[in-house]
């Protein structure tokens, strides 16, 4: 995480697990252990923000239940309780938490950490987290809901991460569709700056073309999607990007 921060990453997709019915485990991605806990992550964030107080960090977070394929299943409600206890007791989060507001800007985030949870951690007023609906659809443009202490807002999500989510298509069709969706959501967001700034957008370039357990599957997607997104942004500079 510290290396990613130094290279310019400011948004993180963290997926904590459970070691038992009451204790948070490490952050995983699917069945892969990152070796980092939520406490570790907060330490990395705090250290970075101390030396870069003008920066802010966004964490998109959800319970990585897929780890439970490797061990007995632990209910989401147990995770919610454990995570709320962690947020309540973690001194770093309590000192750096950014209260969600649908119209917040970077000014409100500087020196702080905003958590957007894909699991409802109500009451959100206790922890200042935001809760968002999510989508893995192979279409974009549907407005979902995001809410917290700062009210209810709209959010647009593009997170089609596999051929399975594209109707079990071929790898080539998935890669083509992924590029199309990334660029389409970029285009949809342009008018927001002028007409309605109270919209949130999460546009994932990540995904895999092939087996979820093969590193080259992710490399294939990155080699296809990342240049397409960059070229689209460069071609539209000055139009809201």
Identify the function of each model-found stretch.
Residues 1-10, 17-241:
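Catalytic cores of phosphodiester-bond hydrolases, prominently lipid phosphodiesterases
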